[in-house]
Design a protein with these regions (language model features):
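Glycine-rich loops and low-complexity Gly/Arg-rich segments
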Residues: 24, 32-34, 68-70, 103-107, ...
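Small-residue-enriched alpha-helical segments and adjacent helix-cap loops
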Residues: 1-102, 204, 208, 215-221, ...
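Mobile "lid/hinge" segments at catalytic clefts and subdomain interfaces of large enzymes
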Residues: 78, 83, 87, 92-158, ...
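Generic secondary-structure signature for well-ordered alpha-helical cores
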Residues: 24-28, 66-73, 137-149, 172, ...
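Charge-rich, low-complexity terminal tails
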Residues: 179-229
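Terminal amphipathic helices with adjacent charged low-complexity linkers/tails
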Residues: 10, 14-22, 26-27, 158-187, ...
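Alpha-helix boundary/capping detector
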Residues: 46-49, 90, 115, 165-169, ...
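Flexible, glycine/charged-enriched surface loops at secondary-structure junctions
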Residues: 1, 33-34, 74-77, 145-159, ...
């Protein structure tokens, strides 16, 4: 499987713009590991490196991630692309999962793992890439516009009157006549994408928010009450019992 996420632990608020500047300069863009938006798209190695792969799952995963990066939604969105039915990328456990077939791509929707796992459902079979992406555009935008706040696609689907048949009718058959509108709205979102790191470091008003102490100088921004210890050649914050902090004694009134 191919999945990349890099965590930088221990950074303080005032340090973030400087870290983002360095990452931007190296060619990185902001991700959304905690936001209500798209996570990195998971992929197996596909036909490029696997004898079982029937299509380029890595290439499609990159295309999908670049298309939907930064997309805001009622809850987090997870996607995966598997290059064959052996399903090494676990696409049938994602909000949107794609599996390669001999005739195209199978599109699965509304799955998730976690505390209440739900198997994704097959929305459409043997799609060419253009049709696949068009259906995903419609699905995501229909979900974003109709789901409740903090509602995953799985719960949204379970609460949907008419179930999968209704969802197929809306997304595939355009039963509500919304397809063009949904696609246009997604095109607008994609066309107005911005790298939030770059925006934050280049916009003085936004950058001013990243200060530990508003009235302190740059040299005085570090929070002295944040203390770390080293574990496995990495740092972690000290817990309450480990911290050496001068405390105000409590006395009876």
């Amino acid at each position: 499987r191919v999945l990349f996420r890099s965590d930088l632990f221990g950074a303080q608020l005032h340090e973030l713009p400087f870290i983002w500047e360095e990452l931007n300069a190296a060619g990185f863009e902001s991700g959304h590991a905690y936001g209500k938006s798209l996570r990195t798209v998971k992929s197996c190695v596909g036909s490029t490196w696997c004898r079982y792969g029937v299509d380029d799952s890595v290439g499609l995963a990159i295309e999908l991630e670049n298309r939907y990066k930064g997309l805001r939604s009622p809850h987090k969105l997870k996607m995966a692309v598997s290059g064959c039915t052996r399903e090494c990328a676990e696409a049938q456990g994602k909000d949107v999962g794609v599996i390669a077939t001999e005739k195209g791509w199978n599109l699965y929707v509304c799955g998730n793992g976690g505390m209440k796992p739900r198997h994704a459902e097959l929305l459409a079979s043997d799609l060419d890439t253009e049709t696949l992406i068009r259906y995903i555009d419609r699905f995501f935008m229909f979900y974003i516009q109709t789901a409740d706040r903090l509602q995953r696609t799985s719960v949204w689907r379970d609460n949907m009157e008419g179930g999968l048949d209704y969802l197929k009718a809306v997304i595939v058959d355009d039963s509500l006549g919304l397809a063009e509108e949904l696609e246009n709205r997604m095109a607008h979102v994609i066309g107005t994408y911005q790298d939030e790191w770059r925006t934050a470091v280049e916009n003085p008003e936004i950058r001013k928010r990243f200060q530990t102490y508003i009235n302190a100088s740059a040299e005085e921004q570090a929070d002295p009450y944040i203390q770390f210890t080293e574990v496995r050649d990495q740092i972690r914050p000290l817990n309450e019992a480990e911290r050496s902090v001068d405390r105000i004694p409590m006395v009876e009134a």
